[in-house]
Curated annotation (Swiss-Prot):
Chief localization: endoplasmic reticulum
Bilayer topology annotation: Multi-pass membrane protein
Subcellular location: Endoplasmic reticulum membrane
Domain of life where this protein originates: Eukaryota
Description of how activity is regulated: Inhibited by vanadate and chlorogenic acid.
Tissue-specific expression: Mostly expressed in liver and kidney.
Record family assignment: Belongs to the major facilitator superfamily. Organophosphate:Pi antiporter (OPA) (TC 2.A.1.4) family.
GO biological process annotation, one example: gluconeogenesis
GO function terms (MF aspect): glucose 6-phosphate:phosphate antiporter activity; glucose-6-phosphate transmembrane transporter activity
Catalysed reactions, semicolon-separated: D-glucose 6-phosphate(in) + phosphate(out) = D-glucose 6-phosphate(out) + phosphate(in)
UniProt-recorded name of the protein: Glucose-6-phosphate exchanger SLC37A4
Length: 429
């Protein structure tokens, strides 16, 4: 009876979060999707467009960090649903606006609301799934972004051409509002909310003094493993962003390839990333099922290191072997391999940061490593392009390659340090 109950609620809750987060991501990109139609009606230059999109990016980075902390303090169900409601309302108001300052202000609010989406998902997944299932379902949930990112441009373009860009934003916003209330009804924070026994993924310390055993924020921040994960995530996300943002320019400007090959490389990278995310979750869950969580080391480390090494090798081959005469298939293979090797670790860092933290601080832990990833994404922008400007794209990619190799080597040396963050009882030690 209990097993059927868990299965039913897991299916309903996961489906609600998958659909809800697909809408989160679609409505994060709606401005980009309808941009061609919008500029036909309202003349905006590149600076205006950049200002509007940058306002959202800055707000999203801040909000995602704050939301991670809030998910440890309040209901994840309410946080997720409230954010989706706000995203929908902002898109509706955006549809009836016409000036750059209003566009930027509303898209900043969109960014703030967007940050409320993912951290509650991680919190709910950890409460409802065993450690040996957590990585797989985390990875599958993350593919909601690939789904929205793949179908979104086509759907938005068809709607904008058939009706208008305003109708597209208003319709997608209204759908968010409706689904936000459905998510509030269907998502439950933990099994106890529906009369089922809570899962306990962490080693039990006994009921007596359990509240005293809760770790503090200071103890979490003093855990060396938190900063090992944060540094690794910064490097992996930064290097991945280098390739996704500048890979096309490198191929076209320095390797003499066509724009079509450049865009095809990006598509291959995203397809490889989709497969890599799911594979990383599934394979690392199998390792977790065999070995289980411990205070030192993590069964997911082996796959994480393998994929980080794959990133380094594929970047080296991309930089050294590609020429103007290279077979197109070889370039696509390199893109797919890099996508597979980079999106896998991105999924794993989030999973490990969540499961290695104390239950009362797992959202905060994920928020911290996620913030460091955003720092990596920032470094992949102007600093990376500055190196390319003063030297060459090849030199810039060589720097990223060396940093990735050094990070992989350092993570290998530190793979068996204490991985349980926060307070550890004397018995566990």
């Amino acid at each position: 009876m209990a097993a059927q109950g868990y299965g039913y609620y897991r299916t309903v809750i996961f489906s609600a979060m998958f659909g809800g987060y697909s809408l989160y991501y679609f409505n994060r990109k709606t401005f980009s999707f309808v941009m061609p139609s919008l500029v036909e009606e309202i003349p905006l230059d590149k600076d205006d467009l950049g200002f509007i999109t940058s306002s959202q990016s800055a707000a999203y980075a801040i909000s995602k960090f704050v939301s991670g902390v809030l998910s440890d303090q309040m209901s994840a169900r309410w946080l997720f649903s409230s954010g989706l409601l706000l995203v929908g309302l902002v898109n509706i108001f955006f549809a009836w606006s016409s000036t750059v300052p209003v566009f930027a202000a509303l898209w900043f609010l969109n960014g703030l609301a967007q940050g409320l989406g993912w951290p509650p998902c991680g919190k709910v997944l950890r409460k409802w799934f065993e450690p040996s299932q957590f990585g797989t379902w985390w990875a599958i949930l993350s593919t909601s972004m690939n789904l929205a990112g793949g179908l979104g441009p086509i759907l938005a373009t068809i709607l904008a051409q058939s009706y208008s860009w305003r109708s597209t934003l208003a319709l997608s916003g209204a759908l968010c509002v409706v689904v936000s209330f459905l998510c509030l009804l269907l998502i439950h924070n933990e099994p106890a909310d529906v009369g089922l026994r809570n899962l306990d993924p962490m080693p039990s310390e006994g009921k007596k003094g359990s509240l005293k055993e809760e770790s503090t924020l200071q103890e979490l921040l003093l855990s060396p493993y938190l900063w090992v994960l944060s540094t690794g995530y910064l490097v992996v996300f930064g290097v991945k962003t280098c390739c996704t943002d500048w890979g096309q320019f490198f191929l076209i400007q320095e390797k003499g390839q066509s724009a079509l090959v450049g865009s095809s490389y990006m598509s291959a990278l995203e397809v490889g990333g989709l497969v890599g995310s799911i594979a990383a979750g599934y394979l690392s869950d199998r390792a977790m099922a065999k070995a289980g969580l411990s205070n030192y080391g993590n069964p997911r480390h082996g796959l994480l290191l393998f994929m980080m090494a794959g990133m380094t090798v594929s970047m080296y081959l991309f930089r050294v072997t590609v020429t103007s005469d290279s077979p197109k298939l070889w370039i696509l293979v390199l893109g797919a391999v890099f996508g597979f090797s980079s999106y896998g670790p991105i999924a794993l860092f989030g999973v490990i940061a969540n499961e290695s933290a104390p239950p009362n601080l797992c959202g905060t832990s994920h928020a911290i490593v996620g913030l460091m990833a955003n720092v990596g994404g920032f470094l992949a922008g102007l600093p990376f392009s500055t190196i390319a400007k003063h030297y060459s794209w090849s030199t810039a990619f060589w720097v990223a390659e060396v940093i990735c190799a050094a990070s992989t080597a350092a993570f290998f040396l530190l793979r068996n340090i204490r991985t349980k963050m926060g307070r550890v009882s004397k018995k566990a030690e």
